[in-house]
């Protein structure tokens, strides 16, 4: 490890590279592999920290690099995506380094009091499909195009149905695969950030419907993550 790692979990972006950290208490060894090291899963061995955590700071890793963890278990080596990934190529693909603060625009916004909220429940995939192909789902950018319409109805808050990464493109969102990653077909974390910004400048609050108590039946890369039996 070339430098003191940054604090946090997942892929933490800093001025001198990216720190990767994962909790894998049953692993014998963990390596980080990705586009920054030509997907070689034998050269960048992560340091075993306390309480089952593993970390590695890679000075050459950057935003939009893809990566996985190569976990050595008693029965062999397995490759797993990052449970804390903020972005995925797809629900059964690679994790992607994402910087929450890059391109972030600040603005003044204050949510109305609870007793004054007029909430519209919104499904991103079907709310606005105007101009899209028959089987193409809507996304955050298309949804943002109709925010003025919602405002004209007196709506001052939208509750978006779950947008955590799920298998396929068509879903209500209650079958998540990665709890911190934003569904790619909806526009990923960049799309969500755009939607929130456009909502706030119109005085519309954004409420997230989240699913943390269960996962879906497919693309369960987190199952037996570090080889536990």
Please give the residue ranges for each predicted region:
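Substrate-binding/active-site clefts of carbohydrate-active enzymes
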Residues: 111-114, 123-229
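Short beta-strand elements bearing conserved aromatic residues within extracellular beta-rich modules
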Residues: 30-32, 67
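Glycine-rich, histidine-containing beta strand-loop boundary motifs that form or position
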Residues: 22, 34, 58, 71, ...
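Short proline/glycine-enriched turn/loop motifs at strand-loop junctions of beta-rich domains
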Residues: 23-30
